[in-house]
């Protein structure tokens, strides 16, 4: 896996080593570091990911390809919610769209599900997006244009395949990213509105 390049700010020392955690989903739990909570938010804007300390909840996307569970009740805080669940978030089945990256949002690009048949998208990734490479974070991109913890996600590849393939080591990558930057990252992981 390629190294993450610094962008628009301080460098990311040793992040490339920390992120070599493919097929080790419990890595962040063993290290006890902060683990970012993945969002499934139904909007184009980036949303801060709340780091949780030592969360060892299983991923809602299983290798069997089952759909994620419904979002938790509104009174459950992000710290109490299982990994990948946020109160009020709208889960989108991974087979409904393609994983793309919006290049027009600020402070950095965000991921969203797009594709033919989804509102607001005229093409494979929509008019304001291009294939997703790297992770979107506060102050700029991490690994933009190089191999990322998720790998390269061309718009022609169904999101269901990419999400299931990249989910386990994405959890560890978010933890490493949080430790390197002293906080969480910003993501949008849902359907873009019309």
From Swiss-Prot:
Residues 25-156 are annotated as: Disordered. Residues 104-113 have a biased composition (Low complexity). It comes from the Eukaryota. Residues 43-57 have a biased composition (Polar residues). This is Putative uncharacterized protein FLJ46641. It comes from Homo sapiens.
